[in-house]
């Protein structure tokens, strides 16, 4: 078995991509009047401390590695994309959530990275939140947990797609695809190859150049001929 995932790679043969873990952290504090901050637990403040922790984790891996210079950026990254909490200025916010993610190099253990996050929450941040009240805390809602991809250049699928596209080299990308799932969970050798550029993805006026579509069509014609022969 083999698998070809048709995400936008400019028809380059991609054998490795980063994994991705994304989640929403729900912070539950205790409300009160802002003139008496000691009588409540400020969910926004603790959520902000969590965001700073994630930023520092990202800085740690940027500085200390592991590194792979064929990826851009060349290290595991952490990102906080959304923070929302509170109702008005003079009320201690009871609720806040943070949407965050990390994108790990394929050889950087996702479970180890998740462990760093939960260790910080369970052993540092939540105990601080519960110094006065024990009905406060943090819940993690997992949005996606996608393994990275690391397919060898000597795999049959890699050699086949290189031959059919005329590629001389393989590549690595920082965005994620279902390829990691097929490879890790289904034990199916997988590569990513498709028309268009990721630089035009997820933004207004997405487009794929006609030349890219023509190259993809030619590739599919050749692939179909190979499959018919087999």
Model-derived segments and their meaning:
Residues 24-230:
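Metal-dependent amide/peptide-bond hydrolase catalytic core
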